[in-house]
Curated annotation (Swiss-Prot):
Main location: nucleus
Pfam families with a match to the protein in the record: Fcf2
InterPro entries named in the record: Fcf2/DNTTIP2, Fcf2_C
Source organism: Mus musculus
Biased composition (Basic residues): 630-639
Crosslink feature (Glycyl lysine isopeptide (Lys-Gly) (interchain with G-Cter in SUMO2)) location: 210, 317, 345, 384, 560, 586, 608, 628, 651, 660, 688, 733
Compositional bias of kind Basic and acidic residues: 377-387
Subunit structure: Forms a ternary complex with DNTT and core histone; interaction with PCNA releases DNTT and H2A/H2B histones from this ternary complex. Interacts with ESR1, ESR2, PPARG and RXRA. Part of the small subunit (SSU) processome, composed of more than 70 proteins and the RNA chaperone small nucleolar RNA (snoRNA) U3.
Protein name according to UniProt: Deoxynucleotidyltransferase terminal-interacting protein 2
Name of the coding gene: Dnttip2
Comp. bias (Acidic residues): 515-550
Biased composition (Polar residues): 1-21, 155-172, 231-255, 321-353, 431-440
Residue(s) carrying Phosphothreonine: 612
């Protein structure tokens, strides 16, 4: 319990003169020590020359100054001096010094006090929300119980006290003052958490809370938690944390209430304080009822948790049961329990398959909604009360700490009771449904909603599901393999001719044996049908069982159609099995052929291994020098194919008749045109590297004189023959040459005649 400065100031006015002097001196010395260690703005009052005088003067003049300021509706720093140790040591809120010289600052601090008064409302709202979240966490979480604390920022009920209680509060021991001083040192980390909590509050919660006037200075903060929550928190903690002392918890708890204490110490008590006493009694009664409900819920949840762990062991043993029976039994139990949990208590009755599916969907939806609300409340409570996670168990009190849940209005108590009832009903029904269900799949389905709060329980249930599914799959696969081996119509031989031990055909059975087998199958079917009728009713048969019946019927019909009833016209025995090979004798010694091929390869290798005079050339790697010369020769041949890098790697063309004629025409180019003179070509023969081409005029410059593509020729000779001027010149030259030859011939004839005449 933390007694603030305001309580001491009121008791000083009503007590004797001796008590007025004794108690303030002790508090003044403690206040001066704390000012020197933690405060920045108290230098004007703590000077070494006026230490003792400031103690007495500050206490005598405190109440008078407060009355003047409150009458003017203005806030001042003297309220903070008389409100408690926390107002002096708080660093994050700006401290305004009010001295004789600097009284102008009083008008500017009126806004800050209004803000502080407005911020009290979210604290009440957060306390109400914490109560609701705590109740939901006790009911919903089996494995995780999150104890939360209920802080009362303004204890209106404790403001009215008897004269005897006030006299006792005046004489406070030094130990309590030292505890309050220790708690005041921890204000700095707590103020940041309190500011964050104020930012997280919703604006709608401000309108719900009401602040009644009265003396709001004395604050008694007690944690609202039951013995069961203390036990669960101790079990959740490690052993090292259980044995440690709870000094830090009490210190931080006291610091929270020092931090949250308001500073309006000058207000007088009104007639509403008498009403607050009655309100406090009603609140305590409500809190006691809530704690009893929480105890009962926690005890029931612990019992149900033990039952669930026992059911897990039963589920592992019963994992080989079929899915259809589990669904039928679980659905009957769920329907009966659902009707029993309703307030009307209707008689139980069996539903058809579509109604059952609809009911399962509704159950899934209901459980999903419950889990979502629980998760949101859990997150909200943990986010807003993260710094008070260890206060419920660290308080150390059992039933002594429970009934002091002060600082809650009548509206809050009425509102906090409603969601508790609403939230506990679906959770209880859900847990009661999971108690009686012994079949594995449906129990896992229902318990999965509860296991969302703990990772370990989720992992265990997932492994159970996977083990059951794998077991069913393996059993079905083995059954299929056995059925395939026993009742196979044909067998595929992957290695024909080698495995002669297997029978590749079905032998013809006698008709008597076939009839006996059919009778046995019919008797087995009748026994199975009788067992199914005794175990399951006709209304609870699933579609899966019907499909299995159809498959078994079709399978029996197919088995009757054996090779004896069908005449293919071929005898499989004569053909050597399913592989119709007319040369069966050649395929039988297949292994011998493979061995013969291997022996031939060995013989060839042995023959090559014999030493002969030429074995060095055959089986030896050529030396490095020879290979180097060969590479040089190959490079030379490649170079000779082209004219070199100077001619851009021009290759030597193949000499054809057309190219030879072109080369001859180019040699005689001096006689083609008399107007042009060419140097005589000294080469004899044809060149090795050459390319023949024509120079084409630019069409933009010589458009009319250019040769179109249609008139262009492939070779030089064809172009010369197509040229008209060349043909005209060629004809004239040809006629001249022929005339000279004729003249020369006539002259020779005349000379011969003269010789004969002589």
């Amino acid at each position: 319990m933390v007694v603030t400065r305001s309580g001491l100031s009121r008791t000083r006015l009503q007590e004797s003169s001796q008590q007025k002097r004794s108690a303030p001196r002790r508090i003044g010395t403690h206040l001066e020590s704390t000012k020197e260690s933690g405060s920045d703005g108290s230098t004007a009052e703590s000077q070494p020359a006026e230490k003792q005088h400031s103690r007495s003067s500050s206490r005598t003049t405190g109440p008078a100054e407060i009355i003047v300021l409150i009458s003017d509706d203005e806030a001042s720093e003297t309220e903070s001096h008389t409100s408690g140790v926390t107002s002096v040591l708080e660093d994050q809120e700006p401290i305004v010094r009010v001295t004789r010289k600097r009284q102008i600052v009083i008008a500017s601090t009126s806004k800050s006090t209004v803000r502080k008064r407005q911020k009290v409302a979210p604290q009440h709202a957060s306390a109400d929300e914490v109560v609701v979240s705590e109740a939901e966490s006790h009911v919903s979480g089996v494995s995780m119980v999150v104890p939360s604390t209920e802080r009362s920022s303004r204890n209106k009920a404790n403001s009215q006290r008897d004269s005897s209680q006030e006299s006792q509060s005046g004489t406070v021991s030094d130990a309590e003052l030292s505890c309050s001083g220790i708690s005041s040192l921890e204000i700095l980390p707590r103020t940041t958490a309190r500011n964050v909590k104020k930012k997280l509050q919703f604006p709608a919660e401000k309108n719900d809370t009401k602040i009644t006037p009265g003396n709001k200075k004395q604050i008694v903060g007690m944690s609202v938690c039951s013995e069961d929550s203390d036990a669960t928190q101790l079990s959740a903690r490690p052993l090292s944390q259980r044995n440690m002392p709870n000094v830090s918890d009490s210190e931080t708890y006291n610091s929270d209430f020092d931090d949250s204490s308001p500073r309006n110490s000058g207000k007088k008590l009104t007639a509403q304080n008498h009403q607050n006493l009655h309100i406090q009694e009603e609140k305590r009664a409500n809190v006691v009822s809530l704690t009893e409900v929480r105890k009962e819920n926690c005890k029931s949840l612990d019992e149900e948790d033990l039952k669930i762990t026992e059911e897990k062991v039963i589920n592992e043993k019963d994992s080989q049961r079929s899915l259809s029976e589990a669904q039928d039994t679980s659905l009957q139990q769920s329907v009966s329990q659902n009707h029993s949990s309703t307030p009307n208590k209707k008689p139980t009755f069996q539903l058809s398959s579509p109604d059952r599916k609809a009911l399962m969907k509704s159950l899934e939806h209901k459980f999903a909604v419950v889990n979502v609300e629980r998760w949101n409340d859990k997150r909200g409570g943990s986010g807003k009360k993260s710094d008070l996670a260890q206060l419920g168990g660290g308080g150390g009190g059992g039933d002594d700490n429970e009934p002091t849940g002060a600082g809650i209005s009548d509206d809050k108590s009425s509102q906090s009771g409603v969601p508790l009832e609403c939230d506990t009903k679906p959770c209880k029904s859900e847990l009661s449904m999971t108690q009686d269900t012994t079949d594995s799949p449906v129990l896992l389905f229902l318990s999965s909603d509860e296991s969302q709060q703990s990772d370990s329980s989720e992992n265990e249930r997932d492994t159970l599901c996977s083990v059951e599914n794998n077991g069913q799959k393996e059993a079905s696969a083995e059954d299929l393999e056995d059925a395939a081996c026993d009742s196979a119509l044909f067998v595929i031989d992957k290695t024909p001719g080698l495995s002669a031990d297997k029978n590749f055909y079905l032998e013809d059975k006698a008709p008597s044996e076939v009839a006996i087998e059919e009778e046995k199958e019919e008797e087995e079917k009748e026994e199975e049908n009788s067992e199914e009728d005794s175990s399951d009713s006709d209304e609870n048969k699933d579609e899966s069982s019907d499909e299995e019946d159809l498959l078994s019927n079709t399978k029996s019909k197919l088995l009757k159609l054996t090779s004896s009833s069908i005449d293919p016209g071929l005898n499989i025995k004569q053909l050597g099995g399913l592989y119709i090979n007319f040369n069966v004798d050649k395929l039988q010694p297949h292994k011998e052929t493979l061995t013969q091929i291997k022996e031939k390869k060995k013989n060839e290798l042995l023959q090559k291994a014999v030493i002969t005079p030429d074995f060095e050339k055959k089986h030896c790697v050529p030396p490095y020098s020879e290979s180097k010369h060969r590479l040089q020769k190959q490079r030379r041949k490649e170079r000779q194919k082209t004219a070199g890098n100077g001619w851009f790697g021009m290759k030597a063309p193949e000499l054809t008749d057309e190219l030879k004629n072109d080369l001859r025409a180019l040699k005689m180019r001096a006689g083609m045109d008399p107007k042009r003179f060419y140097k005589k070509n000294d080469r004899d023969g044809f060149p090795k590297y050459f390319q023949v081409g024509t120079i084409v005029d630019n069409p933009a410059d010589f458009y009319h004189s250019r040769i179109p593509k249609k008139q262009r020729k492939k070779t030089i000779v064809e172009e010369l023959l197509a040229d008209s001027e060349f043909r005209r010149f060629n004809r004239r030259k040809y006629s001249e040459i022929m005339a000279e030859k004729a003249a020369n011939a006539e002259g020779k004839k005349f000379k011969k005649k003269k010789k004969f005449r002589n």
